[in-house]
Structure formats: C-alpha cells, structure tokens
C-alpha cells in the first residue's frame, strides 16, 4: 500500500502495520458472512457479539443480510408479550439458578435486549439478575450507525419516501402501545413463515424498517437511562452483567459508560438525520453528562487511568481494591467516535467537512463545545487518554505486546470457578485487544497498533492467536471457540477504521 504520508515520523511502523492489516483483512474475509453468532460451539446469537459482527458485515457491503439481522434482533426486544425469557444463571444473588421471567419481571426489563437469543429453542436469556448494559447499548450503537451511514451515503432518502410507509407510529404512541403492538409484530420463537412477508416489505421499503426499529431503540434508551440508579450520570451494573460474565464485577464500570455514550451519540446522529432534532439534542446532553461524570468520578489521578468503582457484596459498599482493566479502552473509543454528527469527538473537532452533515447537527456540536456545564476541557481529556494508554501498556501488557484483560488475578469468580490464566481470569483476549488497538489508533499511536497486530498474527504458533476466543498468557495456547468470529470482526473493524481515518 502506497502511503501518501510517507514523510511523517513513524513511517516504518505505519508501513508494517498497513502490510499486516491488508493481509489480515484478506485472510479473514472468509469468516465475515457465516452468520451473526460468535462461531464454533456458540450457535445462538449473543447480542453484544452481534453488534461487532454486523458492523464488519456492513463494511463489506452485505447490506441486505445486515438489515434482515437488525430486524430479527430487535424483534426480540423484551416487553410484555408471550416471549419466553429466563434470567439469573450468572447472578450470585440468585444462587446462579435459572429463573423464568413473569410479567412483573418483563415489565422491569422492558426495552432491554437479551444477552442471548436461542432462536432454535424459542427462548431468550438474560444472563444476570438484570439485562446487561453493554448488550443493549452496543446494539443501539451499531444499529444507529448502520442506518445513519445507510442514509447519509445516499443509499436511501428517508424523508422523501416517509409518506409511503404504512401508518408510521410516533414515538409517543409506540411507548404507550408497546405491549400490544409487540404481540402483532413478534413471535415467541424464531421468525416464522407468517412474519417473513413483513420482513420482505421492510427490505423493499427501508422507511418501514426505520419505523420498526427506531421507536424500539427509544424504549431501549429509556431502559439504559434507568440504570443510573442514583442519578449521578453513571450507569450501574450488577454482578456478571457485562462481557466478563464470570468476573463478578458490579458497580460503576467504565466499559458500561463507554457503551452507553456510544449508544447515545450514534442514535443522536441517526435521529438528527431523520428530523428528530429535539430528541437528538436530549441524547447529546445525556451523553455529555456521562462524560462529565466519568471524568469526575472514574478518573484516578493516582493510577493515571480510568478505573471502575466496584461494589463489594449486596450492600452496595465500594471495593477497596481498584483494578485496571483493558476494557476501559472502549471509553477512549467512545469519546473519539467519528460519527457524522460528531457531538462528542475530540479527534475530529472542527475537521469534519462532509457535505452530508446537516446544519442542525452542526449547531448541536457548537452547543456542546460551548456548554458552560462542561467541567473538563477537551485538552484535559486528551491528556488523560494518553496517560491511560500509557498505564495500560505499563501495567497490563505482558511479554511484549500481549495485554491481559485484568492487571491482577481475580480473587473470586462465578458461576464458573476459574483457575489462574483461564477464561476471564488474567488472560489475553483478541477481541478486546482489537478495541485497544482502535483506541490507540485514535491517538495516532501507530507503533503500538503495529505491536498489537504483530502479536495477534505471529506466525510461530500453530494457529493465528487472533482466531481464538482467549489465550493463556503463560503457555501461549489459544482456547475457547475457534474461529471466534467476534474477535475476528472486532479486529477487522479496528483495522478498517484506522486505515480509513488515516487516509481520509
């Protein structure tokens, strides 16, 4: 690949990175379109995993199948219909026992997406005591980003053809009618032959798809906002209600805030595109409030990084030990996200020259920049991001460029009692390393991106480490699902973002 910026410092790192990235993208293309399940023995749909896989599929141009999958997943949003939902298998408060959700529980969960959709069995599972924040937030983010990109690319003009959509339902009406409406558009198991005609019409008329999904994402946002239990701007999760679902992590988790910021920012951009400026503006303010809260409460000057505030026990007391985790890197991705609305982005401030950006969206960004409630400047956040990346490298990277998901071994795990260097206990996970690589690229740390990609694709192993679910850092042996398409797609997404942003 010829580099038009060849005279910049770090040319060799960048050139090597481009070569490795090109090879990885070419070698992994065969895995992109094998479904939205994570792969191997994971035959069902994990919502958080699907969020990354669908982005990768959309980037390769598989628009039709991606839109079908979005419809399918949002048809499983939790409400008061007859859908079978189980929960609690990962909750210590429920003794790690499966519970069947009754109408009262469904009402509590309403708006969230399940952790897993077992489509063949006709059952959805919420793994913890409550729906995990990241599954719902990441799918809101991905869905919004795909539809927003679809519209802004001129593939379809929403506003021009909206009148042709059959009886579009307003947001307020949908919220009032959610339980009854869902019985009409959704089944308790997989989409059957009766629902397929609607799906076909959705793909022929994208306005119908948008009118089906967007109101559901509004309800999802209401659910996510309700997870800020003490109204301090930070969402709280219970035990095992995130991707590390054996680590017994609960509290105000940086990774959750990042997922929520991504959801709010990307959905705001989509709403802006379809003319819902007021709601878009509210979402922007909500995202900004969370950024301010993260900077105020989750930044540790002593650690030089963003650190979770974890709860110890069911009484809600904070754990004394503060542990750095690799997934805080998602926060750095969230605050540098290059949506065309660009409400929160540090990296692209004042540099987005796209002619597709509406004047109203530009005004949102102007208001965000000049909002007197901002407590921390962009410059300070940039400095903190750089310190966080350096701290991760110092405290989490082992044996060169092999970052572990936690800086220490976990004191307790459950329901799976993990040995040291097993699964979520102090191990190397390619998928979250892809997120860290993306975060480093956002701050032009291309040499470190090259180091990480080199480790993921080293040839002195029987199989490329990037293809495994997780890796034992002591033995260097890959384990779990293989090939693990969540990891492959996340790395591909990071590489594509890095290459496109560098050359744009």
How would you describe each model-predicted region?
Residues 13-21, 61-76, 153-182, 190, ...:
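Extended, well-ordered alpha-helical scaffold segments
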Residues 3-45, 79-130, 164, 226-251, ...:
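Extended glycan-interaction surfaces of carbohydrate-active proteins
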């Amino acid at each position: 690949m010829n580099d038009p910026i060849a005279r910049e410092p770090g040319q060799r790192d960048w050139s090597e990175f481009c070569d490795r990235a090109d090879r990885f993208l070419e070698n992994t293309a065969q895995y992109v379109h094998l479904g939205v399940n994570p792969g191997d023995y994971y035959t069902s749909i994990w919502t958080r995993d699907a969020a990354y896989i669908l982005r990768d599929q959309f980037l390769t141009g598989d628009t039709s199948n991606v839109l079908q999958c979005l419809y399918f997943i949002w048809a499983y949003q939790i409400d008061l219909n007859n859908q079978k939902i189980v929960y609690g298998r990962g909750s210590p408060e429920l003794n790690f026992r499966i519970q069947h959700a009754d109408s009262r529980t469904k009402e509590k969960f309403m708006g969230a997406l399940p952790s897993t959709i077992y489509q063949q069995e006709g059952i959805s599972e919420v793994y913890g005591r409550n729906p995990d924040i990241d599954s719902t937030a990441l799918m809101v983010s991905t869905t919004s980003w795909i539809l927003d990109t679809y519209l802004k690319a001129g593939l379809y003009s929403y506003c021009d053809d909206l009148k042709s959509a059959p009886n579009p339902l307003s947001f307020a009406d949908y919220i009032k009618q959610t339980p009854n409406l869902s019985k009409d558009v959704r089944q308790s198991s997989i989409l059957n032959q009766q629902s397929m005609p609607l799906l076909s019409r959705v793909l022929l008329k994208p306005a119908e798809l948008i009118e089906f999904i967007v109101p559901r994402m509004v309800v999802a946002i209401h659910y996510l906002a309700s997870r800020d239990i003490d109204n301090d701007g930070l969402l709280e999760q219970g035990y095992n209600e995130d991707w590390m679902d054996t680590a017994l992590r609960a509290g105000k988790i940086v990774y959750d805030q990042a997922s929520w910021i991504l959801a709010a920012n990307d959905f705001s951009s989509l709403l802006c595109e379809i003319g819902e400026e007021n709601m878009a503006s509210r979402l922007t303010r909500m995202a900004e409030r969370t950024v301010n809260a993260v900077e105020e409460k989750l930044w540790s000057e002593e650690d030089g990084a963003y650190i979770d505030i974890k709860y110890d026990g069911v009484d809600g007391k904070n754990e004394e030990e503060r542990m750095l985790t690799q997934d805080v890197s998602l926060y750095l991705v969230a605050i540098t996200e290059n949506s065309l609305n660009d409400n929160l982005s540090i990296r692209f401030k004042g540099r987005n020259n796209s002619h597709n950006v509406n004047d109203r969206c530009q005004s949102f960004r102007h208001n965000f920049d000049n909002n007197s409630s901002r407590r921390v400047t962009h410059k300070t956040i940039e400095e903190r991001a750089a310190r966080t990346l350096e701290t991760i490298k110092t405290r989490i990277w082992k044996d060169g460029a092999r970052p572990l998901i936690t800086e220490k071994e976990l004191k307790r795990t459950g329901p799976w009692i993990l040995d040291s260097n097993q699964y979520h206990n102090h191990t190397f996970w390619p998928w979250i390393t892809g997120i860290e690589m993306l975060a480093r690229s956002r701050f032009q740390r291309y040499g470190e991106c090259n180091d990480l990609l080199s480790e993921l694709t080293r040839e002195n192993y029987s199989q490329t480490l990037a293809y495994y679910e997780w890796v034992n850092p002591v033995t260097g042996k890959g384990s779990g699902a293989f090939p693990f398409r969540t990891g492959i797609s996340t790395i591909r997404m990071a590489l594509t973002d890095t290459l496109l942003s560098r050359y744009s």
